Amino acid sequence: MNLTDYVKEVSRQDFGIEFQHTASWNSRLQTTGGRFFPEDGHLDFNPKFCKKGDAGTFRKIVRHELCHYHLYYAGKGYRHGDKDFKDLLLQVNGVRYAPSIQSNTFYHYYQCESCGQVYQRKRRMNTKKYACGNCHGKLRHQNQS
């Protein structure tokens, strides 16, 4: 079953209303579970929440975005702060906020040879070009995690 069919099924079962547009994956989403676009009515979802393995959480995220969708087309308040949105979200048991995702970010660690200050960086840096910010000592690349 593709994503649009799944969203249509959730809309039919939980709202009793048909979903008329498309749903797609958007891997550029970082902290949000999904987005609703009022301009053309399509929904974007973060694939990280589906890959996490918790189908119940992803279904709640779909309900959240469908609340935006159905309220917008009903001419009611569809934004997060609107009472109509909060009431419908509570009624269908959707999530208010997307749960945090454990990131598997790779870090490089650098330690000053003089003062022992440790620096954590996401990107590797040239230790010949940079020095310690405290004592201007030489930096040494540590084991990465």
UniProtKB/Swiss-Prot annotation:
GO cellular component terms, A-Z: cytoplasm
Keywords per UniProt: Cytoplasm, Metal-binding, Zinc
Domain SprT-like stretches: 4-141
Active site (catalytic residues): 65
Signal peptide: none
Cofactor: binding comment: Binds 1 zinc ion.
Gene Ontology process terms (BP): response to stress
Positions of Zn(2+) binding: 64, 68
HAMAP family (UniProt xref): SprT_like
Protein name: Protein SprT-like
Origin organism lineage: Bacteria, Bacillati, Bacillota, Bacilli, Lactobacillales
